[in-house]
């Protein structure tokens, strides 16, 4: 179970939500609104979304989609979710438009092949995906 903390500061109409460890980092959010109940509901939605994305993009979680890709994409084509395919295409766009400075691999994005029908493969044994710099802003 994910450890979370939150507190509503009535005098400031401010809500602070905190998750000490998700996606390899801590997560803090400040929300401003006078309706504490509404903010609590929004916080629950945010937690659920962060947990969902963590199950896709966390390269250290053996149950995540990216962990499986990093483990098997060199041996064969790996089927990926539609969302991960869109994320990879977006990351490829950033890679190409930043003169290769933005790179979600630990080596060289050009060694990833994104195939039709939501499939991916790696062309080199030293490639792995790391969304640490991307996932937090996604």
Where are these regions (language model features)?
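A contiguous, well-ordered beta/alpha segment that forms the leading edge of an enzyme domain
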Residues: 1-132
